[in-house]
Amino acid sequence: MGYQNHPSGSNSFHGEFKRCHSKPSKGAVASMINSEIGAVLAVMRRNVRWGVRYIADDDQLEHSLIHSLKELRKQIFSWQSNWQYVDPRLYIQPFLDVILSDETGAPITGVALSSVYKILTLEVFTLETVNVGEAMHIIVDAVKSCRFEVTDPASEEVVLMKILQVLLACVKSKASNGLSNQDICTIVNTCLRVVHQSSSKSELLQRIARHTMHELIRCIFSQLPFISPLANECELHVDNKVGTVDWDPNSGEKRVENGNIASISDTLGTDKDDPSSEMVIPETDLRNDEKKTEVSDDLNAAANGENAMMAPYGIPCMVEIFHFLCTLLNVGENGEVNSRSNPIAFDEDVPLFALGLINSAIELGGPSFREHPKLLTLIQDDLFCNLMQFGMSMSPLILSTVCSIVLNLYLNLRTELKVQLEAFFSYVLLRIAQSKHGSSYQQQEVAMEALVDLCRQHTFIAEVFANFDCDITCSNVFEDVSNLLSKNAFPVNGPLSAMHILALDGLISMVQGMAERVGEELPASDVPTHEERYEEFWTVRCENYGDPNFWVPFVRKVKHIKKKLMLGADRFNRDPNKGLQYLQGVHLLPEKLDPKSVACFFRYTCGLDKNVMGDFLGNHDQFCIQVLHEFAKTFDFQNMNLATALRLFVGTFKLSGEAQKIHRVLEAFSERYYEQSPHILIDKDAAFVLAYSIILLNTDQHNAQVKTRMTEEDFIRNNRTINGGADLPREYLSEIYHSIRHSEIQMDEDKGTGFQLMTASRWISVIYKSKETSPYIQCDAASHLDRDMFYIVSGPTIAATSVVFEQAEQEDVLRRCIDGLLAIAKLSAYYHLNSVLDDLVVSLCKFTPFFAPLSADEAVLVLGEDARARMATEAVFLIANKYGDYISAGWKNILECVLSLNKLHILPDHIASDAADDPELSTSNLEQEKPSANPVPVVSQSQPSAMPRKSSSFIGRFLLSFDSEETKPLPSEEELAAYKHARGIVKDCHIDSIFSDSKFLQAESLQQLVNSLIRASGKDEASSVFCLELLIAVTLNNRDRILLIWPTVYEHILGIVQLTLTPCTLVEKAVFGVLKICQRLLPYKENLTDELLKSLQLVLKLKAKVADAYCERIAQEVVRLVKANASHVRSRTGWRTIISLLSITARHPEASEAGFEALRFIMSEGAHLLPSNYELCLDAASHFAESRVGEVDRSISAIDLMSNSVFCLARWSQEAKNSIGETDAMMKLSEDIGKMWLKLVKNLKKVCLDQRDEVRNHAISMLQRAIAGADGIMLPQPLWFQCFDSAVFILLDDVLTFSIENSRKTLKKTVEETLVLATKLMSKAFLQSLQDISQQPSFCRLWVGVLNRLETYMSTEFRGKRSEKVNELIPELLKNTLLVMKATGVLLPGDDIGSDSFWQLTWLHVNKISPSLQSEVFPQEELDQFQRRNAKPEDPPVPGNEV
């Protein structure tokens, strides 16, 4: 456990050597070693010392080094059988002896090192080789103890390089697992010594040494993922103290007591002026009284006493190394290495070097650090504490490296570093990037780059928001980051810089990350609801931090609480009482305040003014004292020394300088501290006295006005016998004294706002907080909290992006801005944030060329050539097409762009059409939509012909160039190219889709679009016409929900009609637009027929001049409407409008033909006659019959239409009779049909007086036909009397009058014909109705009326003569009538000869007409016979014959 646990023979870094070297064969190994022996001997022979001894050929004089090499040469070829079983020490040791010898020079030592390096890299021995561990150990030990004579600096550096080479090969070798923890520490120590010594050598050696060190760290920590945790890993001993940090308040840098980089120089340094120095890397023991510490000893001292260090390397050596790297940072601080101290090169100073090594370790170890508590603790405390300090360095290089480390820590260990990360963001990154604390531009840029790198991580902002902004104990890091980025993106009094672009990139990365997480389907509702009731907010916990179903509603709830807490804190800072009352009102504090709830409010709320809080806690009021004690109980002081606990306690508020308040505060603190840590102190009084003494010591040590400082002895003496009469341990008090002396207990006046500087007290609070904070929430790829975050960041992002977009010149920056704005548009639509989308549209529209004071020429050129204008235009219409559902007020700006494009004549011709749904769109129209091959621009065909105007643009100049009266220059090729490009841009924008696809818009957005079209139409007539066309197109495209917008559309069109006095294009479009809407929608919306047709009444409201101008076209459109939709119109209301329009055309010369065609289509053969439109059609037909516009045939046809309609009445009557069984209903329908018939009779009667003979006579004939058609109709009996009274009798009277008046003007023949027809009409009508009316009481009156009119006709003279035809016809008709009456029993002889009986009355009138008729109808014989048969005096008169 705790050591490397690889699969057999595997190592993560061995692949490098496998690629470069192949393992030698058994024979080759011996040959290779033999070669290396020869090489070493050859170099030795070149040396005078070794050469003389060799020449002497005296075995006794041969040196042991040479002898051992020769002996090895004798043996190697005998080992060829299996090198795996040969102890490596046998063939390694002779080379190591050369390395260890202090008699060899640098060249010899270098060759020996090369030989060892070759043996290691060629894998002569592996883990399976016997005694491999001992072999690896002696190699490391020998190289560490390398001795040689220095002859020249170059050879010395070569040896140092080869030392590094061999040590690195040891770690990279397959046999590296044979190294112990001690060996690894030795290797690292040795390399560090070379690194330091290289500072006085060449730059090449410096680079190689540092590179080797990085490689070592990478190799070592790359094994961390394969190492299992130790059972007792937390108990691993590290020589240096862990987590004990002293602070220098003056420099702001940490001090360290466990190392000094200068000691390395003292230990490893050689006299450069003395070339005879024998050792470059001497091993020297340092005495303690020299107060110098060698780096190697730091690691080795801890290793010597532990058996774990002798085991195969694993966690123990990694803990030592990582702790040492953290220590190196402390050493750097003590050595005061900063941007102003540059011993070699600034980028290679100790802190930067240490940070680079740490970064390498974290990169390779990655998430595996969390499996090892000791390493994790080093990161959480030591490392982060140093990072907080070096983050405030003036060096951009150091800050950059620190930020890289933090990024790696975030990516790999963020779940274990929640509070530390929050502190780094707040105290370092945000503070530096804010540029208000003396940071240089380079520092700000580095900090900004780090923030942007973090924002580019997919889950960063979501996790920051969930873990910090939604935690009441943490600051709002997400809001701070977004605000900072948005502010830094704004150029202030200067040009756009890289910083602005960088900040903008961070903002855009945030919104693009959100946009990538959202799905295609829109959420139903993502707005959380919270129950408003009192709850102890500090006790709210999540059941499962790993399940979004639990933590998402939890963090939203906490965020809701936090918002109210922040408001409460703000009010508390201004007025504590009002603040507490507010918190009670929002249910965060109970209705009756209790000390615990107020104390928890103080403890867990961010943003409180520490001064106000300190005054409250120090107040002598009893409730405040209770709150103070409850506040102290919220701290956990277990296992803390008193000084640390006091720092933590008083760091949460401002301790007042008033003695009584200090006393109360320290009393509460002491009571709590003693309760939890009663180990050394005997009672709480001792804790109180010591705490008070610490406060006094703090003032004494760090107050500038105190000249004589308290010494350690003074402090110890002052605290004698305070522990129940006994003294506290001297070591305990000494530790407290030095802690306070080196690091002040800072009680600054924190106002609760802004980014503060990290202090010792704050760091202690961070460590304390990290132990009790809630678990870190890891977010996945889902957009759980994106709505909440987007609502915060959208406004600032739009504003910042717009400013950068306005000032940027590079196209890639412009594209980046557009990408960000489109991401915002996507999110706004996804979360239904219409106001955000509207703001975005407004911002983008400002960058189009349509809102600038440009001429038409300039606008087209800008659109065609300027990238900013082009991108903005494309983005506006992309948003309108893709996210139009969620645009409200933004439609106004979009339509202004469309109107501007229309004025520039670069819109597609079909922009305002609904061609996709129009079945009658002609081929020619479709051809117009195709782009012309001619590059010369042509004015849109959709422009109204009645509105000729001269364009000021070069398009207009081109068209007008053909006019001989005007001479204007033709547009240049550049202008034409710009126009062509602009037209292509507009085409790619698919502006027509906005209106054609409006049928997919949500109701609210559609209504906003319609309203915007109406509002945009008031600027000029051309714009009004274009907007009206668009409005009509939108209406037609939304036929399935026409009621949603129709009232608004109709009101607008009605206003146009009523306010227009003369013909113009606008009113023309309005009228025919309504007709088109009705034509297109009636087939699909039968339930809206009445509503649509009612709208046509606006045509009736046209001014006379306007109506006259368009009457013919109106009639033609009505014909189309009727022919296409007659079967869909069922109600009287709908037909009333149609018939009214047709009736108007009857007297219009051009329109009457089309109007009558429509009427004939409706009435012919009763095709579309209905009870609901019957009377209306009769009236219209009457208008056409009476109208003298057109030929006589049209009037006759109109009369025929009326008379033929009687068959429809007969059919309806028969259908009613067959389908209705209820008598009442049948009677009602009969009455309605009767009324229609009577209406028919009356309307025909009116035409019977027409001045035109053909029309008049034909009308009488058709009236007779209509009356005759009543046989098939169930007419109520009283209706016949109405027919005679209101039609027949009046007709005869009027005809007679008409004939008399016109007898002088017309031929007697035509007058007689009319009288004859009228007489026949009355006679036939009477006979037809006789059966139905003879039994009615009014029959006698009607009969007398008939006789009177016959008598009048007989006696009337025309031009002094009676009409022969009339006088011949009437007796015949009367005779026929009397015979019918006789046959039917209506007229019978009466025996009341002297009375006024029906019989007598009849003959009284008949005899005046023709005296002979009585004898012809009733011969005397029949009369006598009738009287004899019925002579009974008592019989009453025949019924019905009374007058």
Swiss-Prot record:
Any GO BP annotation: protein transport
Pfam families: Sec7, Sec7-like_HUS, TPR_28
Protein's membrane topology: Peripheral membrane protein
Main location: cytoplasm
Keywords carried by this UniProt record: Cytoplasm, Endocytosis, ER-Golgi transport, Golgi apparatus, Guanine-nucleotide releasing factor, Membrane, Protein transport, Transport
Signal peptide: none
Record-annotated disulphide pairs: none
Compositional bias ranges of the Basic and acidic residues kind: 1425-1435
UniProt keyword annotation of Transport present: yes
Residue ranges of domain SEC7 in the record: 554-743
SUPFAM superfamilies reported in the protein's UniProt record: Sec7 domain
Entry keyword tRNA processing: no
Locations listed in the record: Cytoplasm, Cytosol; Golgi apparatus membrane
UniProt xrefs under SMART domains: Sec7 (SM00222)
PANTHER family: ARF GUANINE-NUCLEOTIDE EXCHANGE FACTOR GNL1, GUANYL-NUCLEOTIDE EXCHANGE FACTOR
Protein name: ARF guanine-nucleotide exchange factor GNL1
